[in-house]
């Protein structure tokens, strides 16, 4: 009887602890850091003439082809503390699967209305916010968005984000090598959303957890 009471008490204690972790902002994220992935060949060493967080409004050239995506979230350290002043960079292909990079195949066909690269400095609440395009498959790889995070001039994280449940994911070499706990956190769920008045598209929310404390 005593053993049964002890077992029930232990189970209840565990459930309460798990609920506490789930409901406490930032605490759950500190369990795993965001997995790193390779930079890839198309990081823009020469940046576009205009660099901001809205990749669809570039030099007044008009709207690029493709489905709009709002990608937003927060940046935490390992303790679950929100990080202010981190520079989040993203780069990706256009709606034709082409990068704006001198080594990219078919670069001459890149949609010049698309910025292709963006940057955002996190606020006091650790938040970042981009308006970009839903990525498309390219070079036999599933849709993905490349990400770098800096603190000052120091690069803290390089990784890639993928679309959850996309059929191309199972064919990708990098995703098939996800052997370590937490690698699934590179998958983001996209939902229909009103990004801003008059602009409908997809919404993806992703919180980065850096492997260091600051």
Name what the model sees in each region.
Residues 1-13:
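Bacterial N-terminal signal peptides that target proteins for export
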Residues 3-6, 20, 202:
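Intrinsic disorder/low-complexity segments
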Residues 6-9, 24, 28:
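Hydrophobic alpha-helical segments with strong N-terminal bias
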Residues 8, 21, 37-40:
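Generic N-terminal simple sequence motifs
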Residues 27-187, 197-214:
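Beta-strand-dominated extracellular/periplasmic modules and repeats
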């Amino acid at each position: 009887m005593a053993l049964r009471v002890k077992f029930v008490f232990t189970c209840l204690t565990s459930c309460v602890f798990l609920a506490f972790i789930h409901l406490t902002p930032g605490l759950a994220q500190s369990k795993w850091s965001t997995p790193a992935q390779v930079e890839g060949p198309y990081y823009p060493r020469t940046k576009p003439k205009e660099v901001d967080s809205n990749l669809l409004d570039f030099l007044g050239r008009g709207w690029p082809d493709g489905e709009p995506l709002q990608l937003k979230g927060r940046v935490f350290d390992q303790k679950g503390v929100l990080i202010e002043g981190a520079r989040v960079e993203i780069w990706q292909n256009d709606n034709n699967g082409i990068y704006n990079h001198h080594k990219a195949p078919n670069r001459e066909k890149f949609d010049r209305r698309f910025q292709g690269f963006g940057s955002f400095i996190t606020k006091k609440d650790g938040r970042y916010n981009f308006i970009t395009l839903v990525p498309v498959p390219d070079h036999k790889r599933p849709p993905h968005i490349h990400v770098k995070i800096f603190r000052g001039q120091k690069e803290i994280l390089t990784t890639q984000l993928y679309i959850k449940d996309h059929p191309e994911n199972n064919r990708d070499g990098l995703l098939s090598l996800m052997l370590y706990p937490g690698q699934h956190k590179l998958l983001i769920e996209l939902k229909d959303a009103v990004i801003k008045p008059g602009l409908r598209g997809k919404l993806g929310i992703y919180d980065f957890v850096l492997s260091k404390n600051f």
